């Protein structure tokens, strides 16, 4: 008699590899997009502010599952773009995380005392130099807890990609369950696998927070 707790592990390990790939690449792109959008939300240029705000509100106002289906099926139908599943998944995570990171960036920058900008001007720095050398380093330190939480949220959101048959952890577990007709063991081990990833991530985040005293 097979031990399904053990037998399912190779399937889930394959899923973890893809889960981590999508998460790291997607969140990295999302951070760049979020930083640009967050600064756009602080811009005095109405066009830049408007574009950034529309993007953030659309993403935050719609479920990520809808975003996944729209990117994978909707764009293919509308524009004739045949995205492969992994590319579509990375785009979805990047766009979703980017919107939330934009608000983290906006809040982090706004949390810095305005006197810091005045100090930059008194030193002869341009607004962009003040942002780069004075505001941004301080703001980034304050953003770390929220950015870490967003990474964990995005990691867990990858489970939704099973709806487009991306071979991440949940999909692999479901495939095993459907072929062996056992459900408790695979889904229990799926939960364990997510905890194996997220608990160390949370511990690392707390360690960084303590080191930086944020």
Predicted regions and their residues:
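Transmembrane alpha-helices and adjacent helix-loop boundaries
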Residues: 1-214
């Amino acid at each position: 008699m097979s031990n399904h707790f053990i037998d399912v592990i190779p399937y889930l390990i394959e899923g973890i590899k893809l889960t981590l790939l999508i998460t790291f690449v997607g969140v990295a792109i999302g951070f760049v997009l979020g930083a640009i959008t967050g600064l756009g939300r602080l811009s005095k240029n109405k066009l830049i502010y408007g574009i950034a705000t529309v993007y953030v509100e659309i993403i935050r106002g719609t479920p990520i599952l809808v975003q996944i289906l729209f990117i994978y099926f909707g764009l293919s139908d509308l524009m004739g773009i045949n995205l492969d599943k992994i590319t579509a998944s990375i785009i979805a995570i990047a766009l979703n995380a980017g919107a939330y990171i934009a608000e983290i960036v906006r809040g982090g920058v706004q949390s810095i005392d305005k006197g810091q900008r005045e100090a930059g001007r008194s030193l002869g720095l341009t607004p962009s130099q003040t942002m780069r050398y004075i505001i941004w380093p301080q703001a980034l330190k304050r953003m770390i807890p929220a950015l870490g939480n967003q990474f964990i949220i995005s990691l867990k959101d990858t489970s939704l990609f099973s709806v487009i048959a991306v071979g991440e952890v949940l999909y692999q577990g479901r495939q095993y369950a459907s072929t062996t007709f056992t459900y408790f063991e695979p889904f229990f081990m799926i939960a364990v696998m997510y905890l194996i990833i997220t608990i160390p991530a949370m511990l690392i985040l707390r360690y960084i927070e303590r080191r930086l005293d944020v």
